[in-house]
């Protein structure tokens, strides 16, 4: 069978997202608003298949056809009759659930491919003898012929998402390299175009000269439009000797369905902010305009404390190998008032707490823009994965001048808290009970600080298009050098475009460090209801959780390519390195032998040294992170961050050897089953499913009752239209990296 790195185990944890009580408390109008927003999110989430791998849309279409014709129990009878064992059929269900959960065949957390853990010929027998194949023999056989090989292939380039020889990505055509990505970013910057809703396709003429297409996501294609904001950009350009063409219409039929549902949601908006927000999102997805999405986000920021909260669009850039294109996501959630009250108290203290951060006031925003901070129970989260907390929007210009919102996703955190003692790796026995007791509360504190005062803090020094600066060049001093500011962001440059491949992880590291640093502040712990010995335990478990996570992070490092595949985990490893470097026995990692006779390890944190050794080390590191970010010093930022993120086998830690131990004892990330909403007359019903791979599959089989077959056709048509860009996805066209 396949290497365990590339399969999902049969005993993978599966949890259901509990939002029954939150949904019950909604009024009929709020339910209708949530229903249509959920439909929009689920439709848009299908675009992620096209953003992940060339074969993902076909795999999704094949699975959807199979399970629409026979539910998991019915298909099981057929599979056993075809000679599969119970374990092999369960492996197939887990694979299918994984594809639905990640919206593709690469893990959303780690960007590693996963393949079915059963023989290919056995799966082929099940598929070609299924009810779906009886009903539509040509279509099912065609889908299998298109994706069967790629579904199982683990040749080196296909094991991970990446650019050029490093991996596979559908944000770029298969012949693009990192140099192409940099050139395209410079082109986009020169035209003041955002990369968030784009993909890049490169073609090479007979003389080897490249030609680039930048394609915007939109309902409209080449049709004339009244909107000059985007249409004036839709043309041919010459940039540094290379032809560029800006086009639009990517994912058009999918976005058409998103727009139709957003139009319906408008009728149930609670206020004018929501109505205007939806109108701008509709404009954005119709025209391909990120500027319209920014305007919608402005109204969204102004919509303080809504009962039903949502956000939708091309948002997070973690999975673009270059770090600037957004993956589609949409969520709909309901406010949890009790937990939100704690976060509101944290917001009320935020201005005071910002002063505790280890950089001068001139490196903080000129005015603190009081954000919304709510705890939400998720009803729908469409995309490749569900985070525990979010700080959005990601647009730097809005964050600096208009503000942002923070959300903590309470029912997602509840799934994350559930820890079984026997699965707690790398901890001392006497730490395990304390860890289980305080992991949940400490995580609430860390998520709150990470989102509000981590992502929400710090200023970017900018020179605008008129040459004006947002800082005083004469008086502002760099605390690291003692000199005046030497570098800054010029008009059109953003954090993501400037720091590109390290931007996401560097920013997560800054936010995580702020959480660790500020959780030492007594006022913070009082806000969350902890004092005395309990407060000390919360601090200890928060720091212990971080250093353990730094060790677990090694699973997400690829030694062959010298790269990290997950931004948050790279950030946690960097923090572990900083705390190890602090010395004095603050953190130690000891290789051991487990009770099973196999390699193991133990992480120890000396709680008596957190304040005396850990805090000063974190203070120095955090100040450097912020100064380099504020000043847009890419060279300095890369040197610092990549230095700490380097993984070697040098003693005393021998991280590459430890990585083997981590892989040996890794636990797969849980799959989460989400409910559906269904409209019956004018009533919206909540449909829940069991916490199992079969339950997760059923939830997807019932997600698109009206137009499932149509969506499968749309996905395969869109994938086929661009298939030539990855033909032989395992290798780039000759002459191209």
UniProtKB/Swiss-Prot annotation:
Keywords: Acetylation, Aminopeptidase, Cytoplasm, Hydrolase, Metal-binding, Metalloprotease, Protease, Zinc. It catalyses: Release of an N-terminal dipeptide from a peptide comprising four or more residues, with broad specificity. Also acts on dipeptidyl 2-naphthylamides. Optimum pH is 8.8. Its cofactor is Zn(2+). The active site is at residue 451. Binds 1 zinc ion per subunit. This is Dipeptidyl peptidase 3. It comes from Homo sapiens.
